[in-house]
From Swiss-Prot:
Protein name: Succinyl-diaminopimelate desuccinylase
A GO molecular-function annotation: cobalt ion binding
Enzyme Commission code(s) on record: 3.5.1.18
Keyword check for Amino-acid biosynthesis: yes
Broad class of enzyme this protein falls into: hydrolase
Subunit details: Homodimer.
CDD domains: M20_DapE_proteobac
Key words, A-Z: Amino-acid biosynthesis, Cobalt, Diaminopimelate biosynthesis, Hydrolase, Lysine biosynthesis, Metal-binding, Zinc
Cofactor mode of binding and number, as noted: Binds 2 Zn(2+) or Co(2+) ions per subunit.
Species the sequence originates in: Shewanella amazonensis (strain ATCC BAA-1098 / SB2B)
Gene: dapE
Binding locations of Zn(2+) 2: D105, E140, H354
Recorded catalytic activity of this chain's protein: N-succinyl-(2S,6S)-2,6-diaminopimelate + H2O = (2S,6S)-2,6-diaminopimelate + succinate
Length: 382
């Protein structure tokens, strides 16, 4: 039997969003649906389309400070349909949980943001500052034409975000038990070690790049890059992929390809890590090429208005004392933080994200809506 909360405005909007199969970089009309509701409460709507990516910038108000809800309408592929208990884009509520791709990551958060804004504006039509929405369809993909491009556009016209709340599913066991007040930086290296191909029976006529590289890779894997700090764990170096050889057992390969990644704290910089890696490769006498991919700088939102408001709102709405953390992967917050904005991530429990049978507790979305509205009140109603 359905409970009243499974037919609430936030649940109905969540279901409408899930029903649109917006596998990255598709939006499938999700942003239009959100924009229509935001326009009805006084938001100025500005679509920003860059190549295959649909973005939305919506703002209510012209003065600062600017509170921005940030999120994404794209979802990851569904995987094996046969393993889903229900069709992934035909959302249903079962035993108090709404099922469907994107339920937790992050269409439930998007619905909560919109409904929180509607309720807040109805109660506080003359609020201070501005409320904004920065929504993209390119968060789960290559993140080339999404939030980063919108931020560049805003920066070019000197439009600043003061506080950004990203709706990523931050919670672990209970809604609001964890928020992300920062993220580690991410740096990827694509290394090619050159050798000389030859017959395994005549190693003196070849140069095996696997043998050459192995001591250097072992040294890189043993290094303590830093000790971390009170906000970040120590920097991590991980080899993600390694490939060499022709597939034949009698051929020494001519090159070795290695992909590795750093997740790094604020104790080091990307430039420092690069210099140390190059020093080790050179010390081992390797002939190599290397390309670097900068996936995002580390950022941290310390004590201040946004973190304080978030902590207080979560406790007042849910009774939970939240734990600010910087663990986990990257998010689009990494593109907003360098502008000087304070950034916090708060969203549903993340136990089923990117999995088959993704779901979110319906009552949690009501609580999340309440948290979002309370944060707005604390920051824009002083």
């Amino acid at each position: 039997m359905s409970s009243p909360e499974t037919h609430s405005d936030v649940i109905e909007l969540t279901r409408e969003l899930i029903s649109r199969p917006s596998v990255t970089p598709l939006d499938e009309g999700c942003q239009d649906l959100m924009a229509k509701r935001l326009a009805a409460i006084g938001f100025t709507i500005e679509p920003m389309v860059f190549e295959d990516t649909t973005n939305l910038w919506a703002r209510r108000g012209t003065e600062g400070p600017v509170f921005c809800f940030a999120g994404h309408t794209d979802v990851v592929p569904v995987g094996d349909l046969n393993r889903w208990h229900t069709p992934p884009f035909d959302p249903v509520v079962i035993d108090g949980y709404i099922h469907g791709r994107g339920a937790a990551d992050m269409k439930g958060s998007l619905a909560a943001m919109v409904v929180a804004a509607e309720r807040f504006v109805a109660e506080h039509p003359d609020h201070q500052g501005s409320i904004a929405f920065l929504i993209t369809s390119d968060e789960e993909g290559p993140f080339i034409n999404g939030t980063v491009r919108v931020v560049e556009t805003l920066e070019a016209r000197h439009e600043k975000i003061t506080w950004a709340l990203v709706g990523e599913p931050s919670s672990t066991h209970l809604l609001g038990d964890v928020v992300k007040n920062g993220r580690r930086g991410s740096l990827t290296g694509n290394l090619t070690v050159k050798g000389i191909q030859g017959h395994v029976a005549y190693p003196h006529l070849a140069d095996n790049p696997i043998h050459r590289a192995a001591p250097a890779l072992a040294e890189l894997s043993r290094i303590e890059w830093d000790k971390g700090n009170e906000f970040f764990p120590p920097t991590s170096f991980q080899i993600a992929n390694i490939n060499g050889g022709t597939g034949a057992s009698n051929v020494i390969p001519g090159e070795l390809k290695v992909m590795f990644n750093f997740r790094y704290s604020t104790e080091v910089t990307a430039e420092t890590l690069i210099a140390r890696v190059l020093g080790i490769l050179d010390a081992h006498g390797l002939d190599y090429d290397i390309d670097w991919v900068f996936n995002g700088l580390p950022f941290l939102t310390g004590e201040g208005p946004l973190l304080d408001a978030t902590r207080e709102a979560i406790f007042e709405v849910t009774g939970t004392h939240t734990d600010p953390q910087t663990t986990g992967g990257t998010s689009d917050g990494r593109f907003i933080a360098p502008t000087g904005a304070q950034v916090i991530e708060l969203g549903p429990v993340n136990a089923t994200i990117h999995k088959v049978n993704e779901c979110v507790k319906a009552s949690d979305l009501e609580l999340l809506t309440g948290c979002y509205q309370r944060i707005l009140e604390k920051l824009l109603c002083n």
